[in-house]
Swiss-Prot record:
Component of the arsenate respiratory reductase (Arr) complex, which catalyzes the reduction of arsenate (As(V)) to arsenite (As(III)). ArrB is probably the electron transfer subunit. Signal peptide: none annotated. The gene is arrB. Binds 4 [4Fe-4S] cluster. [4Fe-4S] cluster 1 binds at C12, C15, C18. GO terms for cellular component: periplasmic space. Transmembrane segments: none annotated. The keyword Transport applies. Induction: Fully induced in the presence of arsenate. This is Arsenate respiratory reductase iron-sulfur subunit ArrB. Its cofactor is [4Fe-4S] cluster. It comes from Chrysiogenes arsenatis.
Length: 30
């Protein structure tokens, strides 16, 4: 499954925190 998030990609610093938050929120490891 693919998940979408409402984030401003222009402010993205590539830190990966959004991906970690997404995994935590959706209880998934993939």
């Amino acid at each position: 499954a693919k998940y979408g998030m409402a984030i401003d990609l222009h402010k993205c610093a590539g830190c990966g925190a959004c991906g970690l938050a997404c995994k935590t929120q959706n209880n998934t490891d993939d």
